[in-house]
Amino acid sequence: MSIKRVISGLIGFPIVALVLIFGNQIVIDIAFAIIAAMSFHEYSHAFKVSDKAKPLTWLGYLACVTIALIHVFPREYLMLIIGAVVPIAILLCFAQILITKMKTTIIDAAVTLFGICYIVIFLMFMPIIRAAENGVFLIWYVM
């Protein structure tokens, strides 16, 4: 384990804890969007270094931006937005494959979609839980 990762964890966790305790909803949404972008960057970098796949990073970062926007829309549309993230991502992945004339492979699209589902959608529920009734307490069960 790298000392760089330990130090970033020791610095990062108190910052996230302070944002969750004292931040308003917009600050929390933006903070989790930044965390998702950093996580997706690490995820895609791991695949690029190993030459197994080249995830579509622009699509992953675009999905991360949706976390910052989830409380901009009315609450009754929230589940529709979350449910639309994956089908739109699939559509954009296949459009990328067609536009690049198969230079982007199905494996690249699959790795990208898995990263969006695993990282972005999971982290999207954190601000939603925090905004719920008694969410200030419930968020610590998830963390």
Identify the meaning behind each predicted range:
Residues 2-143:
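Membrane-embedded alpha-helical bundles of polytopic integral membrane proteins
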